[in-house]
Amino acid sequence: MLDQAIQESLDSKRYFSDPYPLFAQLRSTAPVLRSEVIGGWILTRYADVESVLKDSETFSSKGRVTHLLNQLGDEVQPRLQLLHFHFARGLAHSDAPEHRRLRGILAHAFTPRMIEGLRERIKEVAEETVSKLEERSDLIAELLTPLPAQIVGELLGSSREDIPHLIRWAHAINGLYEKGGRISEEKALFAEAMLGQMREFVGKLVAARKELQKRGLLTGEEDVISALVAQGDEGLTEDELLSTAVTLFVAGHETTTHLLGNGWFALLQRPEIIDQARHRPELIANLVEEMARFDGSVPRSWRIAKRDTEISGAQIKAGEIGRAHV
């Protein structure tokens, strides 16, 4: 039995700030660990993680959040209908072939022209935001949070004035989880309310694009929602469109903030790399990619076993949750 202190450290501040020493320890002592802290299995060895993430026949991306919501009891479930609906479908909560279909539709919306325009817009917003920084500034609060939020917001067709509302809604939905990945009733009800407000807001954006389409004024290149609406019957359903737009903002802006924050923290500990990038800007593209690999914003992925199976000698039962650390 693994030492209780190690079990508890899976939920500590130290784990969330720097999990890699613990991962190394687990890889050598318990690479497939049953943890009561998270109510499931923790995988830390590369070969095991790779096999789980590639085996969609045995492990599913669907149902993890709804499984946790159901643990809150029957009485509260009628008040969590939007959360159940949102987390039961969509790009982040589907398996092949449904995941492949949704991904293909979304990829079609990101045309080369849109991506190139987005590249220029990111540069403009970044320069504008940096120009407002004082000599000593909070990079997370003043740059790394507002920058991706504004870009993703504009990508969806929202105005700058809407960004604070989008951030508030996204924080509530992303903040659904307690320590260990569990969900409390209080946070679930708050997230339900915020998700309702966000879906209503996105619904108005979709309705406005559809009105332009009826009048023959929609090109499909105005923003991502316009591109998705323009695909018509070959694209997403109304519910899929709402869920996709919500997911793009909720997942898109915070993961970028965390990636940039982790990257800057790593660079500040290695000033020689900053100096290299300053004198050799051609290295920056590879540097950004390496930042995502070195200390990514989401170092884990959840799966649910579809059937009884075995991972490196550990017996995993159907319906059990696994947390694969990447």
What function would you assign to each model-found segment?
Residues 1-325:
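Cytochrome P450
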